[in-house]
Curated annotation (Swiss-Prot):
One of its GO terms (cellular component) is cytoplasm. Belongs to the glutaredoxin family. CPYC subfamily. Residues 3-103 form the Glutaredoxin domain. InterPro entries: GLR_AS, Glutaredoxin, Glutaredoxin_euk/vir, Glutaredoxin_subgr, Thioredoxin-like_sf. PROSITE patterns: GLUTAREDOXIN_1, GLUTAREDOXIN_2. GO terms for biological process: cellular response to oxidative stress. This is Glutaredoxin. CDD domains: GRX_GRXh_1_2_like. Disulfide bonds join 23-26. It holds the Pfam family Glutaredoxin.
Amino acid sequence: MAMIKAQELVSSNSVVVFSKTFCPYCTSVKQLLNQLGAQFKVIELDSESDGSDLQNALAEWTGQRTVPNVFIGGKHIGGCDKTTGMHQEGKLIPLLTEAGAVKA
């Protein structure tokens, strides 16, 4: 059930950040996306009744257990280092634009 929920969240939102409220890396990714003016959905796993199940499903699906777990345009991006690295390489904004999360 958690896998289906995770997949539905990813497929119905241009950008999804699976996060935890106390995680500084999650905060960094959310701040970056906000600075870029991106529209994104945040799922705080520690605030969801099925957060643990969702995290297990994400680990099974992506091979990544840690948060943040970022998806853009239905594609798994990764965590904080991967997301910020893509931005530093100039690859994040085009991906966000293509996904419809930021205006071109």
